[in-house]
C-alpha cells in the first residue's frame, strides 16, 4: 500500500521531500475533484492525504464518498 497526497503545490512539496512518491498538485477545485476520483480508484493507494480546506471546495457527492471511504483511508490535515 502506498500513500498519496493531493493538494496545492505548497502542501504537497513537504510530502515529496519526505519521500512520498504519489503526490499530485491540484490548483483548482475541478482538478482536485478529478485527481481525487482517479486516486480513490487506484488499488495501490492505502492512505490519501488531503488538506481540510480543499475538502470544502469539492462537490457534495464527492465529499460523501470521501467521508465513507474505508480504502483508501482518507486523512485531512
Report the location of each language-model feature.
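N-terminal first-folded block
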Residues: 1-31
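Core subunits and conserved enzymes of cellular information-processing
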Residues: 23-30, 34-77
